[in-house]
């Protein structure tokens, strides 16, 4: 009890000292006056004054309110059944540790540890790149923190006219995330933090994440003024989930780039949990976090590019085998095969093993394999299958978390030769 008492005294002294210090600081008092005015008025001009400062967003007014759209499509997986014990165990697992494992970026401690870096990067975006910060209210009630950076005029191919919406991974933030890659190339970019990440409120359950993604898309069109066909969706890792869902609901987008993205989160979850808990994991995923990207991206028929990491350590399910076996277990491979089956089923029939063969080839061998001198029907079909693989997937020799080299970010084009 004595230790607890002294700890309480120290906490009171620390917070009391901070309060006194802030009230004596002229700049802080000026910020407080602006914050109170903005909170009371809700006017856009007051919000803009408030954005000169970096602070906890609790209590601020949103710059944009998303409109509920009843026509949006949602993936409805198979109905899962289970005993009361299984249901209860799965619910406990999801809320006790499952969500934290799936989305570590939403953990308070993780956010606190990165807060200094995020503030510095955010301020740099505004001061050095003329970033435009906006707070969006989703239909689920969450406040989503976003940053828009317009590309400079005079870029090749008028890239500034194309908006890249970046969808970060499970520990990614727009301040230090994938938006930097297309920004370096001159594209306009719109980054956003998922619910519970950085200054965004809420938690990243599927409904909240998709509502946030739709709010970002609505904002991009109605406020920033980009047409649907001028928007590229760029998802990294688990960010492929909201990116694919947006593509399914906004099919006229210019293209979709999925970097280090899996087909379905279930095999990855089961590979990292004890086999004795397999049933609990399956129920928990299907009932609470059914991130079945392969089923979602099937709704989209437009330009698509997958980027596979050759040194992938997160999306593999075989950690004990050789390098060849580990690479073969990369779930990006399964996503490619599913896309080929969906878009070009006539090419894959009886040749699915050839996709695995192509995935295992080095670049030089792929180039030779794609130009067979054999005119047989099977050889021609195999050659066209290899061409499809090459069109949809690019290899990047890097680990899962290494930033994507700008040279590998290419907006995909439609593939007309394989109808």
What residue spans do the PLM features occupy?
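N-terminal targeting or regulatory segments adjacent to alpha/beta-hydrolase or S9 domains
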Residues: 1-122, 411, 415-419
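Alpha/beta-hydrolase active-site loop
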Residues: 203-225
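Catalytic active-site module of serine/aspartate enzymes centered on a nucleophile-bearing elbow/loop
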Residues: 347-419
């Amino acid at each position: 009890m004595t230790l607890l008492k002294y700890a309480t005294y120290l906490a009171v002294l620390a917070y009391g000292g901070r309060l006194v210090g802030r009230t004596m600081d002229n700049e802080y008092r000026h910020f407080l006056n602006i914050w109170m005015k903005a909170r009371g008025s809700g006017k856009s001009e007051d919000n803009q004054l408030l954005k000169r400062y970096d602070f906890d967003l609790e209590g601020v007014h949103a710059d944009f309110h998303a409109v509920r759209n009843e026509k949006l499509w949602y993936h409805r997986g198979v109905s899962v059944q289970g005993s009361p014990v299984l249901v209860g165990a799965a619910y406990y697992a999801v809320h006790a540790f499952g969500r934290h494992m799936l989305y570590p970026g939403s953990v308070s401690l993780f956010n606190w540890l990165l807060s200094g870096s995020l503030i510095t990067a955010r301020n740099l975006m505004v001061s050095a790149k003329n970033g435009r910060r906006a707070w969006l209210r989703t239909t689920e009630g969450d406040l989503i923190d976003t940053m828009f950076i317009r590309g400079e005029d005079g870029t090749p191919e008028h890239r500034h006219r194309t908006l890249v919406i970046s969808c970060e991974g499970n520990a990614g933030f727009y301040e230090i995330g994938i938006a930097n890659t297309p920004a370096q190339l001159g594209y306009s970019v719109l980054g956003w933090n998922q619910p519970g990440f950085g200054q965004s409120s809420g938690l990243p359950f599927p409904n909240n994440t998709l509502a946030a993604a739709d709010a970002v898309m609505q904002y991009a069109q109605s406020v920033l003024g980009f047409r649907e066909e001028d928007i590229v969706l760029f998802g990294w890792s688990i960010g492929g989930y909201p990116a694919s869902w947006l593509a399914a609901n906004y099919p006229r987008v210019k293209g979709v780039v999925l970097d280090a993205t899996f087909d379905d989160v279930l095999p990855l979850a089961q590979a990292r949990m004890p086999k004795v808990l397999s049933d609990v994991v399956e129920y928990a995923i299907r009932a609470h976090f059914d991130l079945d990207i392969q089923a979602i991206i099937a709704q989209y028929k437009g330009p698509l590019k997958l980027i596979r990491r050759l040194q992938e350590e997160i999306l593999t399910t075989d950690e004990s085998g050789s390098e060849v076996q580990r690479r073969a277990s990369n779930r990006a491979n399964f996503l490619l095969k599913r896309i080929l089956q969906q878009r070009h089923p006539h090419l894959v029939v009886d040749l699915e093993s050839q996709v695995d063969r192509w995935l295992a080839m080095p670049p030089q061998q792929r180039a030779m394999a794609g130009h067979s001198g054999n005119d047989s029907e099977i050889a021609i079909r195999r050659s066209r299958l290899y061409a499809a693989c090459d069109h949809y997937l690019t290899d990047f020799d890097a680990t899962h978390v290494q930033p994507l080299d700008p040279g590998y970010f290419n907006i995909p084009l439609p593939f007309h030769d394989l109808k």
